[in-house]
Amino acid sequence: MEATQKKNKYEIDMCNGTIMDKLISFALPLMVSSILQLLFNAVDIIVVGRFTGSQALAAVGSTTALINMFVNLFIGVSLGANVLSARFYAAGKEREMSETVHTAMTFALISGIVMVFVGLFCTRGALELMDTPADVIDQAALYMKIYFCSMPFFMLYNYGAAILRAVGDTKRPLLFLIISGAINAVLNLFLVIAFSMGVAGGAIATVISQVISCVLVLWCLFTTDSCYRLQISKLGIKGEYLLQIFQVGVPAGIQSVVINFSNVLLQSSVNSFGSIAMAGYTAANNIFGFLFVSVNSITQACMSFTSQNYGAGKKKRMDRVLIDCMILSVIVAVTLGGSANLFGPQLLHIYTTDADVIACGTEILLYTTLTYFLCGIMDLIPGALRGMGHSAVPMILSIIGTVGTRIFWIYGVFPTHRSLMVLFLSYPASWLATILLQAICFYFVRKKVHSTMPQEEPL
């Protein structure tokens, strides 16, 4: 085993000392970073909704689930790069760390280029399959085609940020997103309002901001003196490391794609209520997204901390990481979910002034935000399992619990009780079902993993 890398001022020691304060130090910048990244889309929606109209708002919002379904397989693979990098870094395996970084970044570039072509040639047909109304489909297709031109930069940023998270650095990605997010907001106001470019202006602003955040993360990787330094001459795919990345990342990506497919089905059900409900769901879903990225940052922390401690052979610390993450996740979800429900109409007014749209959005928030702590718990368990290198079974159980429940609900319950309330109660029902399945899986996987690890001193 090679000497462990000396940590720079941006990195967090995940394997020693108290856990909760380090979790917060890791998760808070990641949470703010994720919120800023979500604001890229939120600014598009707010500016387009306020200055272009409800149809344009519905057009932009109707693309969210579809975009996520297309890109999340590749983003899931970045989780594999994160887990593998964290494990090698904690174990002091510098050569393996370098090979992982260069393989991951090469794959990111290739997948981004592939997604450009997917976006250009598949978006219209996909929107038609979703029964997107005729009055919004042209604008939705235009937005998606422009947005997908940013995919190479989007992928490189996300894979680069995953590598930085693996070594405990969440502060610099936050700084980069503050810069690119501010530019995105200014460009939205400039292109949509001053130049009256509508949804195209919002999409172009997002593309430019993605380019900027990508360049900044690449600069960070190119200039570091650590073992994760990126060098153009070393770019290439090493099958051994890509396979290990895929073993964790592909199941996570497939899970995300399939879950987003269930969200596409849900979007199709919302579409059946008309453009007012679509606009209300767009605004509510954007607020809902802020809850997701907040608790998901804790899941990311759980995965990185678990992976590093697994690499360092500290199984008791792995247990403590999951417990502390659950406590933190419930606190965050209850606080933010309650606030989103309490101030729902005021928050929705940021997106639109249409009273009917606000009423629909408020109703949707009521059914999704108050139980969101269940979603946080549901995601933490497979996050810990992935940190231990187990991803396939959690994927299968998540698909059965989440997607299976939602499909049953959409096609079995919703048709006989057609209302927004019944439709959106599919969320907490699917979260509960998945928690039960994942908890059983965790018990057996933890027992197996711990039996293969050496005895250690008490924490």
Which sequence ranges carry the predicted segments?
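Short alpha-helical transmembrane segments in multi-pass integral membrane proteins
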Residues: 1-27, 85-150, 194-250, 306-371, ...
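Transmembrane alpha-helix boundary and packing residues in multipass membrane permease domains
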Residues: 30, 34, 46, 83, ...
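Helix-terminus/linker motif at the lipid-water interface of multi-pass membrane proteins
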Residues: 35, 39-58, 127-134, 190-197, ...
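Small-residue-rich hydrophobic transmembrane alpha-helices
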Residues: 57-117, 154-173, 280-338, 342-344, ...
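Residue-level signal for short hydrophobic patches within transmembrane helices
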Residues: 16, 20-39, 43, 66-73, ...
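Transmembrane helical elements of multi-pass membrane transporters/channels
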Residues: 25-44, 146, 180, 209-213, ...
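Short runs within selected transmembrane alpha-helices of multi-pass transporters and secretion channels
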Residues: 78, 147-165, 173-181, 202-215, ...
